[in-house]
Curated annotation (Swiss-Prot):
Belongs to the acylphosphatase family. PROSITE patterns: ACYLPHOSPHATASE_2, ACYLPHOSPHATASE_3. It comes from Rhodopseudomonas palustris (strain BisB5). The keyword Hydrolase applies. InterPro entries: Acylphosphatase (IPR020456), Acylphosphatase-like_dom (IPR001792), Acylphosphatase-like_dom_sf (IPR036046), Acylphosphatase_CS (IPR017968). It holds the Pfam family Acylphosphatase. This is Acylphosphatase. Keywords: Hydrolase. The keyword Hydrolase applies. The active site is at R20, N38. One of its GO terms (molecular function) is acylphosphatase activity. Its EC number is 3.6.1.7. Residues 5-97 form the Acylphosphatase-like domain. It catalyses: an acyl phosphate + H2O = a carboxylate + phosphate + H(+).
Amino acid sequence: MSTTIRQVMVRGRVQGVGYRAWLAMTAEAQGLEGWVRNRRDGSVEALLAGRETVVAEMISRCRTGPSAAHVDEVIVEEAGQDALNLRYAGERFSILSTL
């Protein structure tokens, strides 16, 4: 099985609305690996790794997010395996500190 890895930047009203927790919980439930964090510019950044179809579905869900969020834009880029190293040891999916 080939692993697809995508870096996702989500802009809009996505901080202070539970977006990171929602993304981590939803991604883990789908069997994805990766991480999510707030950025100082008000966006949320995530790394999603797993089967291509599952990653694509998660990216689609990111365009809506939790009910309190208002997503204006989702930017998706390819990422390398080394980006997964930002996760905390022993975790499949981590909520990282703000960058």
